[in-house]
Structures are given as C-alpha cells and as structure tokens.
Amino acid sequence: ASGEIFGHDTRISLHLLEITPALKALEGVVMEIEDCAFPLVDEVVITDRAEEAFDGVNWALLVGSKPRGKGMERGDLIRENGPIFVGQGKALGKAAEDVRILVVGNPANTNCLIAMHQAEKEGIPRERFAAMTRLDQNRAQAQLAQKAGVEVGDVTNVTIWGNHSATQYPDAENARINGRPVPEVVGDMGWLRGEFIDTVQQRGAAVIAARGLSSAASAANAALDHVMSMEGTTPEGDWFSAAVPSDGSYGIEEGLVFSFPVRIDGQGGCGIVQGVELGDFALEKIAATTAELQEEKAVVAELLK
C-alpha cells in the first residue's frame, strides 16, 4: 500500500477475506488502513466469500488457518486446516492469470500443497505457489549478525531447508558475511551446528512463551520481504529461501512443497539454486525434515486426489 513493493505508480485494490463471525472486527482493520492515508489504495474489499476475495487478484496471501489448540497433535491440526485450503485452492480459479500465491497459515508447507493441488485443477500452474520460510531466514540472519557483531544486511546466502517447523534446517555453513563464509567469520562450528539451529527452530515457540501470542509483526514483515523478492531480481551471487514445489532437486520428492534456496531472474521466473554443497551433517538434517513433510502429505492424502 505504501509503494515499497510494487512501485510508487502502482495502484492497489486490497481484498480481505475473513470468517463470518470476525467481519465486524475486520471493519476496524479497514478503518486503520484508511487512517494510514496510503496514497495508492484505490479500494478495500472485505468479504467472507473466497471466490469474491480472490476475484482478479495478482497476489494472494493465505494467512488464515486454525491455530493449534492445547493437547492437539500436529496431525490433528493438519486435518483441521486441510479442508480450508481445499476451498481456497478451488476459489483461486477466479484470480488473475498471473496470480502468485504465498501460504503463511500453518502448517504452511502442507497447506500450500493442498491449495496447489486444487488450484492446478483450475488451471493455475504449481510454480505460482510458495509457502513462507522467509521468517525463518530472517531469524537466522539476525542470529548470525548478532553472533558476528555485524549488520543484518551483511549476512547473505542463508538457506532454510525443508519444512516450516521445528525440523527445518537453517543452513549457515553455506551462508556468507561480507562475502566470507560464515564458519570462517564466526569460528565456532559447535555453535553453528547446535545453539544456532536450535534457536531458529524454536524461535516461534519462544515468541509465544514471551508474549502469549504467535509472531505477528515479524511474520507480516517476512511476507512483505517474500513478495518484494519475488517481484524483483535477486542480487548476483545471493539467494533467498522459499518453500516451493520440488522439481526433484537435491533428491527431494517431486511436487513436495519444500524450502530451498531460490533466485528470481527478473522475468518472473523462480528457480531453485543448484550446486549448493551439502555435507553429511546437512544431509541428515534434510532427511529428517523431508520425512516429516512426507508424513504430513500422507495425513492429507485424501485431499490430494
């Protein structure tokens, strides 16, 4: 809405989808958007109908999902949210021909897989879909910057491999700080393979423990970072993380929504970076997160027919 992502000459029509009982509260959100006086916002549409919300959209951010309740197993959460993303995947058939979709609602990778499967039936290519692991990347960059005593912007080539969950593998060994390998700069492989990984994997839980609610501002910021990266051109030599449908790269099952290092070519194409070196430690971590994603896929198998 401010012009920072799509440019200062691009007008914005914002469509907000909410469940019926929460539409009144959504009116308050619209008031706040109006009070921001964004010069590029032409209209704000609020609705509880997915078909209306997705009608003609160029970007769809699927943020809503049922949160995990006390005593609820991850498999139960997946089953609860699956039907939501079946409906949204079908409704995306109303979107613009060039629509891109970012799934934020958890469990993001598998929700993305479900929506992608349904949307493909509506003629939307799977390559338009991604689940968000940019928040995990941002968390990893911040931890590395603090450890090395540098600016966050000095940290590049950070990769999140796999699932947006506690099994994800935050890869610092292929990352760089001011062009130098992170292990060389940090000089502490024990920390990089231990506390660093644990901190990034458990950061969401730590936020909940501290504030009683899940990440909000940082997640919104990461979603904007993702869209901005997708709309731009990736700087030479760098990459960013996104969970995209696998093309078989790195031995990951084709079609599984898996976080890889990716690059944007400036023509709208998103490609998985090839040739990233992975040692035994990394491969073990990647195998664990792959197994979890395959288990999640099995839970929702009926929704993928």
Question: What feature does the model see in each segment?
Answer:
Residues A25, I84, A222:
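Charged catalytic carboxylate motif
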Residues E4-V57, A298-E302:
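Conserved N-terminal Rossmann-fold NAD(P) cofactor-binding segment
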Residues L61-L62, V103:
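Redox-cofactor binding/interface segments in oxidoreductases and associated redox assembly factors
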Residues T10-H15, V41-V45, V99-R100, R126-F129, ...:
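Residue-level recognition of the N-termini of beta-strands and the immediately preceding loop/turn
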Residues E73-A142:
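Rossmann-like NAD(P)(H) cofactor-binding subdomain of soluble oxidoreductases
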Residues V30-W59, S65-A96:
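A structured beta-alpha segment of the ubiquitous adenosine-cofactor-binding alpha/beta core
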Residues A1-E4, G268:
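Canonical Rossmann dinucleotide-binding motif of NAD(H)/NADP(H)-dependent dehydrogenases/reductases
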Residues K121-A130, D136-K305:
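C-terminal substrate-binding/catalytic lobe of Rossmann-fold NAD(P)-dependent dehydrogenases
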